[in-house]
Amino acid sequence: MKLHNYTIMPLDTDHLEEICEDIKHQYENGTATCALFMMTLVPEGNPPVDKVGILCKKYDLFRDRLAEMGLGSGVLLQASIGHGWVLSEMYPYQSYTGIDSGDTVRVVCPYDEGFRDYIKHAFTVIASHKPDTIMLDDDFRLLSARLGGCGCPLHVARFNELWGEGASFTREEISAMLDDPGEIGDRANEIFIYTQHEAMIDCARLMREGSDSVDPSLPGTFCCVGNNVECAAEIAEILAGEGNPRVVRLNNGHYTQPCNHNFSNVFRNAAESIAKLRERVDVILAETDTCPQNRYSTSAMSLHTHFTGTLLEGARGAKHWITRLHAWEPESGAAYRRILGKYCGFYEALADIVPHLHHRGCCIPVTGTPQFDRRKVSGGSGGWSNCVLERMGLPFFFAAEPSGIVCLDGAADAIYSDKQMESVLSGNVFLASDTAKRLIDRGFGDDLGVDIRDWTGKQPSYEMLPYRNNECSVQCGIRELVPMSDAVIEHSTVYHSVSRVNPERLFPGATVYNNARGGKAFVFCGTPNVHYSLTTSFSFLNQSRKQQLIDMMRMAGQLPAYYAGDEEVYFRAANVDDGSLFCAVFNLGMDPIDAITLGCETVPQKMEMLDCDGTRKAVAFTVNEEAKTVTVDTPAYTLAPVILFLS
C-alpha cells in the first residue's frame, strides 16, 4: 500500500518554476505523494488583513502550473488560532488566557464568534481555489502544550453556564477547583475539559461548513499535539469530508536535538498517540519535521531513523518539512530528498510488515486512554527505555496491551487499575524500587517477594553483579530490598566497604521472585530513570549490568535475539506471522558497526535484509556455536537502521 507522504512548500512566487520542478521530482522519486503550500492565517490587524485572499492568489499560480505538469497539490493551514508567536498587529478577538496564571498569549480563543466567522470564511475561500486537500496544523489546540487550558472570559462564562445553579465562579476559583481531590474536583475537571473540547470541535465544524459550501468531497486532515491527542479523532472525522479517510499527523517531532540520546522517546510518543487513535482514524502520519528545515537542526539520517522508527509503531506516512520556507535555500533540502527517495520502497515494505509483527522483549507500557484531568497520571514513563534499553541493544517495544517483560519506574503503575495490575503481575515485570513501593502500598506486596524500606544504615559503596563478580556504582534512588520468602533469588548485592577492604553485605541490589500468579518479578533497589551524567547513569550503563539483564530476560523467556556488542544500539525483535524473526538494528552511537553480531535464542539457517528498494536480499553470516552468536556480514552505520529477517 502506498504511504501518505506530504511535503510542505512555500508560496514563493519568485521561484515558482523551480518549486514546481522540485515538486515533480519529489513525486517521481518517491519522496512525497502530495505537496502542501503553507498559508499562515492566524489573524493580524484590526480589522484582520485578508491573508487568505492574498495567499490564494499566489496559490493559484502554483496550482495552475502544476496542473499543466499533470500534478496536484493542497494547502497547509499552518496557523489558525496561532502558535503564540509575535504578531505584527493584534487581532480584535478574545485571546487565550491561562486558567492558572491568567496570562494571555497571542493565540485566539476558538469560542470567539468573530474569529469563527473569520476562519469559516478562510476555509470557504481556500476550497473555492480548488486544492486537492486542506491540512489544519497543530496550533489548533487548547490543553496540550498551552497554559493548562483556556480560562478567558468566554470559557469562564461557559463553565458557569454548564455548572448551573447560578454559578459565577472566577477564573481563579475554577483553577483551584481543578485541583480539589474530591467530588468538586471531579465535576470541575469534567466541565472544564468539556469546554476546551467543545470550543475546538464546534470551531472545526464551522471550518468544514466552509469547505462543504464549495465542495463536500474536498479532503481535510488534522495535526495534533501531545500524547493525549487532544480531540484529534473527532476533528479528523469532521474535517475529512464526504467519503474520505480520517487522517491525523501525530506529535513526535525530533528537531534541534543536541545528540542521539533519548531517540526512542520519539517512538514512545508515537506509540502513546497511536494507542489512542488506532481504532478511530484511518491514517496516522509521522511528524518528520526538520525545523527550521536545514541540517544544522536535523540531519538527513536523523530524519531517516525518525521515519523508520515511527513506521514501526504503525504510521502510514509522514508530514515532511524538508524545504526552507522563509529563504530560497534549496541546497538545504537536497540531502533530505535523496534519503527519502532512496528508501521510499523500504518505507512502504516496512509499513506493510508491521501488522504481522508480534514483539518480544521488554515492554514499555503506554496507555490507550486520554487523560486530561491534571490530578491524574496521564501516561507511563520512559525511564527504562530512554536511560537504559535504547543504548544496550536489548529488545524492547511500546504497547498498550502488556506483554513481554513490563518495565515500570516511578508512578508508571498508575496507568493500570488494580485488576489490570493483577494481570500485569501474572507475567514478567522489571520494577524500579519506587514503583515496587507503590505496588506494595496498593496491596501487591505478595507478588513481589520483597519489602521496600528506606535505607538508614551504612553508606552503600558498590553493587556486585553476577557477571565475573564485577562491581559497579550503586543505583540512584536506592532503597533496601528485604526478601520476604526463601524463594526470592538475590541476583546482585549491595556492599559497604572502605577502600574495598572487608566488604560488608547490606542488601540485594536486584531480586527475582516467581509469584503465586505465575508471574516473575524482577525488583531493582534503585531506579534507571536518571539524568545522563557521570555520577548517575553508569550503574546501569555497563557491560556487566547488560549481562545481568540478558540473564533476566532469558529467565523470562523474552530474549529471542539481541545486539551483542557495546555500541549504543536501539534494538527491536518480533516474531513474524510467516515464522521468521524480525530484527531492527538502530545504531544510535557515533561508532560505525562494521558487522552486526547478534546473540540468538535459535541459530538461524537463513538471513535476509530489507533493502532500500523494499526487496529482501540474502545476507551472509557466520555462527559462533559456543557463544551462541551470529555475525552478519553487513554494517550498521550511525542512524542507518538495518532490518533483518532470521529463519
In which residue ranges do the predicted regions lie?
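Short, acidic/polar
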Residues: 12-28, 113-126, 232-238, 299-308
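A conserved amphipathic helix/loop scaffold
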Residues: 381, 386, 391, 398-401, ...
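Catalytic domains of carbohydrate-active enzymes, especially glycoside hydrolases
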Residues: 17-43, 128-133, 305-317, 388-398
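Active-site-adjacent "subsite" loops/lids of carbohydrate-active enzymes
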Residues: 72-129, 138, 142-146, 163-194, ...
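The substrate-binding groove and active-site-proximal loops of carbohydrate-active enzymes
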Residues: 4-14, 41-56, 101-117, 184-202, ...
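Conserved, mostly hydrophobic/aromatic
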Residues: 119, 126, 134, 211, ...
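Hydrophobic targeting/anchoring helices
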Residues: 30, 38-40, 132, 143-146, ...
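Aromatic-lined substrate-binding rim segments of carbohydrate-active enzymes
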Residues: 22-24, 40-91
